[in-house]
Amino acid sequence: MRKLANLVSVLTMLISLNVATAYAEQPALATLNAQFETTECALPCKKSIKTNWWMWRTPTQVELKKSNAANSELWTMQDNNQLNYQFLMHDEKRVIEYSSIDLKMLNMQADAEKWQVLNSLVSQKDLAAMKKTKLKKQYQGLDLTTYAGKINGIKTNITWIDALQIPLQLIYVYPKNQITVQLIKRDTADLLAGATTAAQLQAYQQVDYADIGDMEHSSTAKVWLSNATDAPGMHTHGHQH
């Protein structure tokens, strides 16, 4: 069973399932500070792999960070509906910047469709195509709706928090395995506690992804690059000479 090595892999499956569908307009996003747990297991789920991760979301930005990790990912929606991607290395106080060209070369989608799945885990188009049932129970006083159906042929069950535009629980059932994403904590006292601030980001050393290949022979760069193995495309750079 595939191990979820980093946060990119936690969300890759969700994004690949959802961004293939047509883009549908999304309701306004509330600022969110939430912790999720992704569980992957081979059916009948006697053993599982669990990954805890955080999402800090504003209407124009999403930061994703695996619990206790030294790195995080920052996605920012630009005015032109293109996504800006940064890989933040907090211990090294560095940020790897990826241009739109870099993202295309790495086959990473960076448009309004992907933004919707990043900030809500499910697209509005997919929700609209599923069987919808209002629940009597609530989550922290917020209304819940269940959605049942298939996303790209995969059996899917969602318990949706309408006001937050995020799942309380999301279950994908494959022929041989199951993936569950569960909201386990929501901080309402400080919506951005733990998120990287603009001041922190400004103090970090900016590194362009396109320049990393030229740094690999620097002994200083090799030290911090060794801690960037989870950054997109770094396995490719590691094989260049």
Language-model-derived ranges and their functions:
Residues 1-5:
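Positively charged n-region of N-terminal signal peptides that target proteins for export
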Residues 6-60, 200-232, 236-241:
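N-terminal leader/targeting segments and the immediate start of mature chains
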Residues 26-30, 79, 141, 164:
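Solvent-exposed loop and beta-edge segments used for protein-protein assembly and interaction
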Residues 50-55, 73-77, 156-160, 183-187:
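Hydrophobic/aromatic beta-strand elements that line small-molecule binding cavities or substrate pockets
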Residues 53-120:
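An acidic-aromatic
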Residues 63-67, 86-91, 139-205:
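Gly/Pro-enriched, hydrophobic low-complexity segments
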Residues 91-157:
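Surface-exposed, polar helix/loop patches in the mature regions of secreted/periplasmic/lumenal proteins
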Residues 108-125, 130, 164, 169-171, ...:
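Solvent-exposed helix/loop surface patches that form functional interfaces
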